[in-house]
């Protein structure tokens, strides 16, 4: 996740004895590695970025723990990342994990296996740390202040949960944490052998129920901007509008039209 990389880079960039830095993030859907070079105190160059698909959330949010096969696959992936880091002669590194480990009953076992197999000490971030990092990353962008001066909803979508923060007239009104993440919904509703249309209807009804109280209390008025925070937000932007991908913005009407087009496609066509 880019937000965590930003945090780790800030920590490391103050020490100019470090020339090459690696950051690993263990997420709900994948494990990723980024390697950076510090050219001076202000210039940071990304050397490599590798993502390995691994659905840890499929176990963690449906069974309550991460299965042995997924633990093996995770350790193998991290061992490969370690070899890549050695090839770059990395001076320092950080390894972070999201709620996918924090919510797993066998978190300590997984962390122990990672350490025994790779030597990595993984830092599992709390929900508050995770959200703070995400919003700090967004707040650092030039357009953020302009957006919140009228009204905006920052929606942080994760595998375990979503968090919605409402801004009006430059002030933070509320932040609400709702356990309706992508993997949680999929594990709850996604494997029942029902037709796609009925599946979509159930998701819509489920989300409406979860958001009912929130809308009644905080959404009597609409918002001018929606700030989407997600692992795949930029990929989504690129699919909707190439120009939107470049400036990280897309018109609401275009977003709605894109979603309507998806509703007429099968899951295979979408993926």
Specify the residue positions occupied by each region the protein language model found.
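Intrinsic structural disorder
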Residues: 1-7, 135, 162
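N-terminal glycine/serine-rich phosphate-binding loop of ATP-dependent small-molecule kinases
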Residues: 2-11, 16-22, 26-32, 36-97, ...
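Long, contiguous hydrophobic alpha-helical segments, chiefly transmembrane helices and signal peptides
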Residues: 54-56, 101, 157
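Helical "lid/coupling" subdomains associated with nucleotide-phosphate turnover
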Residues: 21, 59-83, 87, 100-110, ...
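Gly/Thr-rich phosphate-binding beta-strand-loop-beta motif of the actin/hexokinase/Hsp70
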Residues: 9, 14-44, 146-178, 231
């Amino acid at each position: 996740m880019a937000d965590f990389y930003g945090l780790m880079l800030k920590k490391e960039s103050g020490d100019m004895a470090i020339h090459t830095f690696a950051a690993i993030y263990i997420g709900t859907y994948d494990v990723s590695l980024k390697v950076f070079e510090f050219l001076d105190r202000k210039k940071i160059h990304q050397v490599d970025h590798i993502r390995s698909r691994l659905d840890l959330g499929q176990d963690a949010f449906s069974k309550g723990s991460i299965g042995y096969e997924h633990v093996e696959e995770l350790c193998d992936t991290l061992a490969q990342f370690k070899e890549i880091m050695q090839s770059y002669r990395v001076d320092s590194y950080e390894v972070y994990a999201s709620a996918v480990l924090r919510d797993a009953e066998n978190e300590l076992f997984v962390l122990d296996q990672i350490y025994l197999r790779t030597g990595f000490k993984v830092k599992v971030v709390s929900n508050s740390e995770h959200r703070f990092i995400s919003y700090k990353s967004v707040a650092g962008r030039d357009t953020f202040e302009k957006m919140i001066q009228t009204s905006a909803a920052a929606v942080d979508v994760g595998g375990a949960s979503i968090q919605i923060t409402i801004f009006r007239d430059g002030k933070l009104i509320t932040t609400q944490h709702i356990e309706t993440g992508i993997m949680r919904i999929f594990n709850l509703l996604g494997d029942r052998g029902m037709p796609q249309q009925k599946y979509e209807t159930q998701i819509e009804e489920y989300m409406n129920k979860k958001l009912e109280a929130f809308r009644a209390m905080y959404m009597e008025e609409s918002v001018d901007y929606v700030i989407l925070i997600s692992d795949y937000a930029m990929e989504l932007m690129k699919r909707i509008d190439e120009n939107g991908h470049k400036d990280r913005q897309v018109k609401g009407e275009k977003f709605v039209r894109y979603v309507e087009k998806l509703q007429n496609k099968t899951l295979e066509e979408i993926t």
